[in-house]
């Protein structure tokens, strides 16, 4: 096949390729990517660009280029969420919920609930990199106490005191503003949300 023409730019040490992902991914080596983070077309609007891609072709390339311990993280919204999970149910693991600050279905609020969330779906073959981005909470001290053998902990004796300075593991619901912060695309996702997901599922210098 003829190599497609690509516009390549270097930004902050990263190479940017402009083109159809189904043209670019075949040029990439097998098992070379640690994280695929994509905001695919949902097929939920009348916009010309909002057409669902061929998911069979997409998964063929995703499965080929992703590392065995890599993560595939895809934004979605119903009914596209169900379609996307069903297209690769064996690799689907769990979802995050992006809680918005502004609802998006303005024209339908008299007929259905105001929509304040989207889904973020996580797929992988084997346990990927997971760097939990700790959240702030109330500090506490877990006092020493006796413990007996149980289902989870077979140890017996005195459990040491645990001091927590307020860090909490992240919940599956993350709130980020979807207000217009100079965005140039009607469905553009918050930059901070994308940063959060990149930090969670990859390390510095990963591809």
Where are these regions (language model features)?
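Core catalytic lobe of class I
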Residues: 1-207
């Amino acid at each position: 096949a003829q190599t497609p023409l690509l516009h390549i730019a270097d930004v902050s040490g990263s190479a940017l390729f402009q083109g159809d992902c189904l043209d670019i991914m075949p040029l990439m080596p097998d098992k070379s990517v640690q994280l695929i983070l994509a905001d695919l077309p949902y097929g939920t609007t009348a916009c010309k660009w909002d057409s669902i891609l061929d998911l069979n072709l997409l998964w063929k390339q995703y499965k080929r280029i992703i590392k065995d311990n890599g993560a595939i993280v895809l934004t979605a919204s119903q009914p596209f969420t169900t379609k996307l999970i069903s297209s690769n149910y064996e690799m689907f693991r769990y979802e995050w919920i992006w809680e918005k600050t502004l609802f998006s279905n303005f024209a339908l609020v008299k007929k259905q609930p105001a929509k304040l969330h989207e889904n973020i779906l996580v797929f992988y073959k084997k346990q990927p990199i997971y760097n939990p981005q700790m959240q702030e909470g109330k500090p506490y001290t877990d006092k020493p106490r006796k413990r007996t053998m149980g289902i989870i902990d077979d140890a017996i004796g005195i459990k040491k005191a645990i001091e927590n300075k307020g860090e909490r593991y992240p919940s599956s619901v993350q709130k980020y503003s979807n207000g217009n912060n100079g965005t140039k695309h009607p469905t553009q996702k918050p930059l901070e949300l994308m940063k959060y997901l990149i930090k969670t599922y990859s390390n510095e210098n990963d591809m």
